[in-house]
Amino acid sequence: MKYYKLTLYAWLLWTCIACQKKDQTFPVPTLKSIPFDPVFNHNSEYILVLGDVQEYTGNAVYAPYFASTINWIYSQYLHGIKIKYILQTGDITWGNRPRQYKVYQQYTDLIAKYIPMIACVGNHDYTYDEKGEIVDRYSSLFTEYITPCAQNWPIASYFEPRRLENIVVSGQLQQMPYDILCLEFGPRSEVIAWANRYVASHRDRTFILLTHEFLTRNGERINKGSYAELQLRNTSYSTPEQLWQKLIKNNDNILCVLCGHNGFMQHLFSKNSTGREVAQMLFNLQYQANGGDGWIQLWEIPADRDSIHVQTYNTIRRTFSSDPVGTFKFKYR
């Protein structure tokens, strides 16, 4: 609790500083083709992961790193790379600010019409009260500002009509039915019940679960002291461990879990009720230099192998992370 209070104080202090920067001029992003990056294999399909981007959208000094990453993705798409999804792990803003959503919109709209760019809602995408608590889930402007980016998402199911916090986006990986299940920060019990019904009634489909808070910076599944527990008020919520027990563990067609929120990169493998190891992955940009420094996570899905190869890559320096927690594989068929 002491750590939480110190972290909350630091966040509120940063918020005050950020408010003083409201007159920042963000560079206008443009797209131009750059050379093919040989990190890609034309015979594979890819999922690209953006972590939490609130530093990119909140500071004009960092925005060029975001723009460079977007342009790199666009260029590889032009070079014929099969990018199936771009996944964003929440915290688009610091405190639900319209200006930051607009920056995110401006930068991601450039490629959203070519590649589904799917985001989940983070704890910083809600409005806080003076105690640093979230007293109204519906305070988030997430749906309002993400809807334009979602025009080409083939949404198969909504928990609530036309709200994007809890949805299923249908798709394919290597000609197999693979869907993205997006869940809100600290999912309510009724949201988990909806997800259970949908996943259980679609056993012919496989799901990648995208939600904001799940692992610690050390790669442990969060049980007690989650930010959902500490911040959400006037609503039910679930801790990551409860989400595992109530939804993920007993549905073998949930392939993996992707989150952000903490640290930089981590992963955990846990056996579900069938004995299959479920990959749980964390990728978060906010604590990196320059708001993210051009880092991205690459998931390579080869046609001729049964495992997804995950690597952490810097799109500006064109180098892989040397940290072994950022490189691993898990089976997808």
What are these regions (language model features)?
Residues 119, 234-303:
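Conserved beta-sheet core of the metallophosphoesterase superfamily
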Residues 21-100:
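N-terminal active-site segment of His-dependent metallophosphoesterases
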Residues 193, 200-254:
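Active-site-proximal segments of metal-dependent phosphoesterases and phosphodiesterases across multiple
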Residues 98-194, 201-202, 267-283, 295-300, ...:
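Extended active-site neighborhood of metal-dependent phosphoesterases/phosphodiesterases
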Residues 48-70, 94-96, 130-155, 218-236:
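Acidic/histidine-rich helix-loop elements
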Residues 290, 297-333:
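A short C-terminal boundary segment appended to hydrolase-like catalytic domains
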Residues 56-57, 94-96, 121-130, 164-167, ...:
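Active-site environment of divalent metal-dependent phosphoester hydrolases
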Residues 15-18:
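C-terminal motif of bacterial Sec signal peptides marking the signal peptidase cleavage site
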